[in-house]
């Protein structure tokens, strides 16, 4: 053995590799047999079961809720269109009413879901994304506007565009106002009965 390959100098040049003890970025290697950072033991010190199956089931449940809400919302709008058809060349009252009422209901629902009701997994995907998302329609609104322009009803087409926008904004504001009034009332009742809680982000 050569002199330059023995002693502490050799150990400093060639550190012993321990399988399973690779260092993490910016940290020291974890000795083999010891839990690494972020390890959460389960009962009895055993590794906790993976949450991947639960997340997979939750994702499927959310998708199913969105799909079911979409079927019901689209069917409701289609039924309203058949019940209250719009004659060609006239103002599309049904589409206008559907979009404005949908804006109001969505604003009211989100206040209840985010500020009042306890946390849920499926109400928002089902009602907001699924039902109201398919109940309201941007494409039919634009198609109706194009048909009005095609028949030369320019004033009616302009009212359909701008009237829907402003009415939708007003309906959204009304839904938020009603929802927040209900939220403030619940806060007052809870405080009156000695059950004061912190409801919402704006009532503190």
Swiss-Prot record:
One Gene Ontology CC term in the entry: plasma membrane
An example of a GO molecular function for this protein is: metal ion binding
Q: Could you tell me the gene encoding this protein?
A: fluC3
Where does the record place Basic and acidic residues bias? Answer: 1-16
Family from the record: Belongs to the fluoride channel Fluc/FEX (TC 1.A.43) family.
Location of the protein in the cell: Cell membrane
Bilayer topology reads: Multi-pass membrane protein
Region Disordered, annotated ranges:
1-53
Please give the name of this protein: Fluoride-specific ion channel FluC 3
Residues bound to Na(+): 133, 136
Its lineage reads:
Bacteria, Bacillati, Actinomycetota, Actinomycetes, Kitasatosporales
Key word Cell membrane present in the record? Answer: yes
Name the Gene Ontology biological process terms: cellular detoxification of fluoride
Q: What is its main location?
A: membrane
Q: Which HAMAP family match?
A: FluC
Transmembrane parts of this sequence: 62-82, 96-116, 125-145, 158-178
Activity regulation comment: Na(+) is not transported, but it plays an essential structural role and its presence is essential for fluoride channel function.
Q: Does the keyword Cell membrane apply?
A: yes
Keywords assigned by UniProt, alphabetized: Cell membrane, Ion channel, Ion transport, Membrane, Metal-binding, Sodium, Transmembrane, Transmembrane helix, Transport
Biased composition regions of type Pro residues, renumbered to the chain: 32-46
Q: Which reactions appear under catalytic activity for this entry? A: fluoride(in) = fluoride(out)
Q: What does this protein do?
A: Fluoride-specific ion channel. Important for reducing fluoride concentration in the cell, thus reducing its toxicity.
